[in-house]
Amino acid sequence: MPEVERTDRPPAVKNSRQEFWTQGLRRSGAPYLSALFSTVVVAQFAQYLWPTAIVLKGQPAGVVVQFVGFGIAVVLWWLYRPTDSRPRAFAWLVGAWASLWVVTVGLSVLHGDLFNLTAILVLPSLAMIWLKKPSLPAMFIAGDSFALALVLVAIASQLLDFAGIKELHYEGWNRWPLLTDITGPIGRWEGPFGNVNYAGPIGAFLVVWGLLRSGWRRALFVLAGAVIILVSDSRTSMLSCAVGVAVLIAVAPRLGAFRTPLLLRVAAPVAVALAFFGYVLVIDPTLNLRTPVWEVFLSQWRTSPVSGVGASGIQSAIDAGTLQSWANHGHNLLIDPLMRYGLLGVVALIAVIIVSGVIATKAARLGVAASAVLLATCLADGISEDLVDWRYLGVQAVPLLLAGLLGAAWLTQARREKT
């Protein structure tokens, strides 16, 4: 008797779905890069929720989450099959970041400073990006994932506070009349990020990133970032946001359907610069007591100019009364590592900035402003804050790394399109 052909198709449908997802993971670097970037946000949130809880083998929640997320990223990275070559721009960028990590971790060991186990994930993460470079669209997707994770944990922390499950911390009083006239006196919001001076620049990143995107992403990220800037009342974030917007206007020939006039492209950064210097000269010449801290840090750096004094040296200055207890970091992108890691650390950091700057400039000349805008925003943050612990791939480090990666990816794509 002849065989009757089966007409039901579920197995084939299932197999086609599996093939679709498998092929998608093989063709795009977005999944693994999104996992790398989003994990640092989730780890930060876990540490906020359970700051003293020991979860596994003596390790706190944030460390455990970081390793789990890294493991997921490794699996996704293994499935990815890139078709692009590894361009020179990526080599310089990844090499500069790796050198900075080696210097800062090595000097931390020399000084006897403590650091957690997630520091060892930085070099493997950089190697993953170097060995299997994501495409430019994949990097934008990863940036969206990172930004969305920031928004979600900010909302979650506020909901937990409303529910009485996890009380938010506030630092000082908010100085925005526009806000306090409506709500009455309220504290400066730090959310799950540990400090208002960390929360504010995260808001600035969200605003700038949102302006670089479109549709619902633009609306969500700009709105969320603006709210965070307002409630955290961080002057640094206001400056960095203004700088990012000014650079976007200056380097982008078009803003959506609007063609940017040359006069506006020149006037925007000039106006921000004049406003900043006017504010410093007339209203706040000490940058909210930053300049006295800088003087002490520079004085202490001279005791060990090459390798710095480390975190232990900063704590010794606090114990001796030379520094106040709140000044446990240098409140400047270069002054803090100068005292902490000496000339070795600062030179390594400047190398990262220079390489990222060259890449961003070349990308801007070829028509993509994202790299230059993000880099300018991050550097403006560093005028009165040092947001990044260079031994980790943390929440504050990702925007700066992303700035360089976007530019390097665009240079690769532009070169490929020319050939």
Locate predicted features:
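N-terminal signal-anchor transmembrane segment
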Residues: 2-81, 97-108, 333, 377-384
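Long extracytoplasmic/lumenal interhelical loops at the membrane interface
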Residues: 281-341, 356, 360-363
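Alpha-helical transmembrane segments of multi-pass inner-membrane proteins
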Residues: 141-172, 177-185, 191-233, 238-251
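Interfacial transmembrane-helix termini
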Residues: 45-68, 83-90, 99-123, 137-138, ...
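Transmembrane alpha-helical segments and their membrane-water interfaces
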Residues: 75-80, 104-159, 352, 380
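Transmembrane alpha-helices of multi-pass inner-membrane enzymes
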Residues: 372-379, 387-419
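A membrane-periplasm/extracellular boundary helix in multi-pass inner-membrane enzymes
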Residues: 2, 156-164, 249-288, 298-302
